[in-house]
Amino acid sequence: MSPSPVERGRDDLGRVIVTTSTDLAAMPWEDLRGVDGATHKVLWQSGDNVIGLIRVEAGRTKPEHTHHGAHHHMLITRGSCVMLGTRVEEGSYIYVPPGVAHAVDDVGPDGVEFFYTYRPVEVGPAPDDDLVVAHPV
């Protein structure tokens, strides 16, 4: 079995990671902090960049929240729910830009599971003072 993200230190830049379906099934689901009926598995993490799975049980919701400084991509892998006012099911893709409120509502009878990426917005360096050119008045 491949090492878990915790065993890998959750920072594996430059390393190939192969996790089989058997390995993935053996990884424990962890409670998603602050959300009853929701669990997750972190598959890879480097700093604040995260790739993982989230599962929300039937009849539960993941309340509205906002990632102010991150891009959030999701691919529904099982079940259905409503996101951003649209019913989504297996195979649906959702992109939520930084700062946009979203929730997981109306979870179907089989719950919903999705693969997600969470990627913080990159902030470039401040302009170099030597490169700032004053324009003549």
Mark where each language-model region is:
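A short, N-terminal "cap"/entry segment at the start of jelly-roll beta-barrel domains
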Residues: 1-48, 130-137
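Conserved short histidine dyad/triad with adjacent acidic residue
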Residues: 32-67, 87, 97-101, 134-135
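Residue-level recognition of well-ordered beta-strand positions that form the cores
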Residues: 55, 80, 117-118
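Short, surface-exposed loop and linker segments with low hydrophobicity and enrichment for Pro/Ser/Thr
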Residues: 1, 61-72, 110
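Ligand-binding loop in jelly-roll beta-barrel domains
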Residues: 70, 87, 98-127
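Glycine- and acidic-residue-biased ligand/ion/polar-headgroup-sensing regions
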Residues: 58, 68-83
